[in-house]
């Protein structure tokens, strides 16, 4: 584990990882760090807190463990580190899902629709 501080471009750091872990335990929306990791095709281990289960589906796009369960977190990390095929399939599914549901083009289309709606409102 290496804490590298704040960086304007996280993609090179994410690409250097084997597994991304976000052990949130309270008050989460949809974490941008998780979305960035998933969009880079990283297999992720996270918790079932807040809106995290929206992009992270256990066994499909990520491994989800109960919040504050250190043993479950450890087991999920060990499982992914030991299984390259599982890392690849979860990472690919994560990227496909995040790009399809939260990709830049989709977000821009949604924002444009909101602006049009706001301008047309009485």
Show where each model-derived region lies:
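Short alpha-helical segment that forms part of, or immediately flanks, the ligand-binding pocket
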Residues: 11, 29-39, 53-54, 60
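Short hydrophobic beta-strand element within catalytic cores of glycosyltransferases
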Residues: 43-46, 56
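Nucleotide-activated donor-binding/catalytic signature segment of Leloir-type glycosyltransferases, i.e.
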Residues: 1-5
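A short, well-ordered alpha-helix in the C-terminal region of glycosyltransferases
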Residues: 72-75, 79, 86-101, 107-113
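Conserved acidic donor-binding segment of nucleotide-sugar-dependent glycosyltransferases
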Residues: 58-59, 63-70, 79-85
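Short hydrophobic faces within alpha-helices
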Residues: 36-37, 45, 73
């Amino acid at each position: 584990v290496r804490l590298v501080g704040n960086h304007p471009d996280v993609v090179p750091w994410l690409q250097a990882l084997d597994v991304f872990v976000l052990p949130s335990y309270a008050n989460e929306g949809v974490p941008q760090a998780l979305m960035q990791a998933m969009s880079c095709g990283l297999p992720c281990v996270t918790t079932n807190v807040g809106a995290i289960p929206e992009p992270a589906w256990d066994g499909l796009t990520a491994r989800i463990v109960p919040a504050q369960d250190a043993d479950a977190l450890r087991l999920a990390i060990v499982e992914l580190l030991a299984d390259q095929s599982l890392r690849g399939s979860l990472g690919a599914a994560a990227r496909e899902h995040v790009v399809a549901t939260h990709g830049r083009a989709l977000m821009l289309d949604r924002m444009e629709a909101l602006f049009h709606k706001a301008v047309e409102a009485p």
